[in-house]
Amino acid sequence: MVRNIVVETMKRSPFTETEVEIVERKGVGHPDSLADGIAESVSRALCREYIERFGRILHHNTDEVQIVAGESRPEFGGGEVIRPIYILVTGRATAYVGDEEIPVGTIALEAATEYLEETVRHLDTEKHVVIEPKIGHGSADLRDVFERGEEVPLANDTSFGVGYAPLTTTERLVYETERKINSPKLKKDLPEVGEDVKVMALREDNKIELTVAAAMVSQRIDDIDHYISVVEELRDRVADLAAEIASDHDVEVHVNTADDYERESVYLTVTGTSAEQGDDGSVGRGNRVNGLITPFRPMSMEAAAGKNPVNHVGKLYNVLAHQMAREIYEETSADEVYVRLLSQIGHPIDDPKAVDVHLVGDVSEEDERVARRVADELLENITELTERIVEGEIEVF
């Protein structure tokens, strides 16, 4: 097969030489990330059920999850949730095969509950949350497209995916900061810190200002002095991480900058997530498939979480574009690599309408040949992504 792969060389300075950069990551306990996580966990659970029953994944998309914030009354040493968080799990799934019924609603409820229990330590899914699955049937034409792709799945949409490599120092710092704050080790050392974490970085030349918003768990904090000590300790740990990752940058760390210590108006929550009061969440409003929000870099607005991992190019092409960019970067002398993939509905996913690869820097003709080869090989094996996504080896937010 001869694929439409175009490799272009861009003679310009790499992005790291720009004066300004902004990067954001919403942590796993942020309402938007919780919506993503629930959507993806439901999709994976359905995939496993379909495989167990029928030996293959059936048509579904569960990429519509809405979190409606509850109401809470946090206070030092305690607090309560007085109106639960409402979570609506919608989408489409195959509920019948012949006369056999698949309990789609039950699977969705169990998957969402399990995900919340694993992700937000202080969230009581029996008291603090109401989960309502409302998953319907997919349209006949898209189910038909799904079923027709026996050897290679057929694209369910005309859509595009974008990716780039490598990550900048600022991007790595933002990603790793959230991962560290939500790591088991930090939660053991500082159990007062909740899972709802948001990290924003502004780089101006060589200076990075890192702003962290971290929900604190009220029942674990005795008073304002205790709260302040936790914030200061968290700031120190983030600063230590920044010294490792961004040693050649001047990094300034801020934590919970909206706090007013004199009025004791601080970021307290009962559960560790702002979804308990005042902050709603939706699939696709947060991190892109590389775990970041990067307004200075190419991004797709596609909500990848919850989409089926078989033929939904909105998911597969964004994952593949980043993988393709990384591997091309590793195998060539390019300073940066940018990849764009375009599908056409009804056509095999391994044969995109267009593959556009940009190599930035002083590259050779051999580098261009390598880029084409890597792109071609990854497209040839695109169906391998499905199992890796189902097994949770690939994250999409």
Swiss-Prot record:
InterPro entries: AdoMet_synthase_2_family (IPR027790), AdoMet_synthase_3 (IPR042544), S-AdoMet_synthetase_arc (IPR002795). Gene3D superfamilies: 3.30.300.10, S-adenosylmethionine synthetase, C-terminal domain (3.30.300.280). Keywords: ATP-binding, Magnesium, Nucleotide-binding, One-carbon metabolism, Transferase. GO terms for molecular function: ATP binding; magnesium ion binding; methionine adenosyltransferase activity. GO terms for biological process: one-carbon metabolic process; S-adenosylmethionine biosynthetic process. Its cofactor is Mg(2+). Its EC number is 2.5.1.6. Catalyzes the formation of S-adenosylmethionine from methionine and ATP. Belongs to the AdoMet synthase 2 family. PANTHER family: S-ADENOSYLMETHIONINE SYNTHASE (PTHR36697:SF1). This is S-adenosylmethionine synthase. It comes from Methanopyrus kandleri (strain AV19 / DSM 6324 / JCM 9639 / NBRC 100938). The gene is mat.
